[in-house]
From Swiss-Prot:
One Gene Ontology molecular-function label: metal ion binding
HAMAP family in alphabetical order: MraY
Organism encoding this protein: Alcanivorax borkumensis (strain ATCC 700651 / DSM 11573 / NCIMB 13689 / SK2)
Record's protein name: Phospho-N-acetylmuramoyl-pentapeptide-transferase
KW Transferase (keyword) present: yes
Function recorded in the entry: Catalyzes the initial step of the lipid cycle reactions in the biosynthesis of the cell wall peptidoglycan: transfers peptidoglycan precursor phospho-MurNAc-pentapeptide from UDP-MurNAc-pentapeptide onto the lipid carrier undecaprenyl phosphate, yielding undecaprenyl-pyrophosphoryl-MurNAc-pentapeptide, known as lipid I.
């Protein structure tokens, strides 16, 4: 929005042309989202407390969690508001990737909102029925896949890129839509599973989102993409604005979500943020790198799959409790130690992912 205004004002003063630079708009985007989160956060927390929108705690979970009962949830809406406002202010609203990503954010956020509302306001422990939940999540993921597939402007936009190797790309054809579906839905649910401790999910989300912004900046610049031998996707650079907004909003939310948390993200935040990571990775053709950088999300998801599979096949559990962060809690690890160690793992994995820019 402000980009249009700057372009108009540039005819009166050339200094306004500086707003065209993605780097400047990225910085302004992160600061705007951070400011909104700091400003709106206390207001939203107070409103949630007044309306008694508090988190219900499982009786069979770690006993240390019982003290968290009643902590306001659905705070992820704060992140979404900050991301959307910042993106609309500083993004190029004629860019298709901006609208596709915001569309995914809206659909997954809406599903998460309804699920949270039914659980904490209507006191329905089942939340949104699973069949309806996954129907609408599938609609959002498949819709994004179709939109990206049918608006692709070059063959590379629908190829699967293998990191660490030069010119290794697999033509996906129509299977690209299926891949997009699994990447978006898989990442969404993985982040949701990770969101079980104070600040555990949001910091890895910020780190991975920021790294994807670097890939978007490089991949959206023809010269950088050629030099680094990564896919050039025209227009992908605008994802830097969304990535920056995600980082700013996420850090602002972490201010209130850090241990001991004043507010929880809820499904409205976890499902939507995971989906945004997925769609950004698809757009910049870095799905495999997302799998590497989001290793904590993968570990949490695999731990649940192994736990369920083992119990059904043998009647025995591999972990004391799944997802795996609860396993460490029941082993006696303090919650802050688990959180920080998972953050450290994410930093390492993000650096490995960024190394693929040069190691080919």
């Amino acid at each position: 929005m402000l980009l249009w205004l700057a372009e108009y004002l540039a005819q009166y003063h050339s200094g306004f042309l500086v707003v065209q630079y993605i780097t400047l708009r990225g910085i302004l985007s992160v600061l705007t989202a951070l400011f909104i989160a700091f400003w709106v956060g206390p207001i939203m927390i107070r409103m949630l407390q007044e309306k008694q929108v508090g988190q219900a705690i499982r009786d069979d979970g770690p006993k240390s969690h019982l003290s968290k009962a009643g902590t306001p949830t659905m705070g992820g809406a704060l992140i979404l508001v900050a991301i959307v406002i910042s993106t609309l202010l500083w993004g190029d609203l004629e860019n298709r990737f901006v609208w596709i990503t915001l569309g995914v954010l809206f659909v997954f956020g809406a599903v998460g909102w309804v699920d949270d509302w039914r659980k904490v306001v209507e006191k329905n422990p089942r939340g949104l029925p699973a069949r309806w939940k996954y129907l609408w999540l599938s609609v959002g993921a498949l819709g994004a896949g179709c939109a990206l597939f049918f608006t692709a402007q070059s063959p590379v936009e629908t190829q699967l890129i293998v990191p660490f190797f030069k010119s290794v790309a697999i033509n996906m054809g129509w299977f690209y839509i299926v891949l997009t579906y699994f990447v978006i839905n898989g990442t969404s649910n993985a982040v949701n599973l990770t969101d079980g401790l104070d600040g555990l999910a949001i910091m890895p989300t910020v780190l991975v989102g920021g790294a994807l912004g670097i890939f978007a900046y490089a991949g959206g610049h023809a010269e950088f993409a050629t030099y680094l031998q990564i896919p050039y996707v025209a227009g992908a650079g605008e994802l830097v604005i969304i990535s920056a907004a995600l980082c700013g909003a996420g850090l602002g939310f972490l201010w209130f979500n850090a241990y001991p948390a004043q507010v929880f993200m809820g499904d409205v935040g976890a499902l939507s943020l995971g989906a945004v990571l997925g769609v950004m990775a698809v757009i910049v053709r870095q799905e495999i790198v997302l799998f590497i950088m989001g290793g904590v999300f993968v570990m949490e998801t695999v731990s649940v799959m192994l736990q369920v599979g083992s119990f059904k096949l043998t009647g025995r559990r591999i972990f004391r409790m799944a997802p795996i962060h609860h396993h460490f809690e029941l082993k006696g690890w303090p919650e802050p130690k688990i959180i920080v160690r998972f953050w450290i793992i994410t930093v390492i994995l993000v650096l490995v992912g960024l190394a693929t820019l040069k190691i080919r």
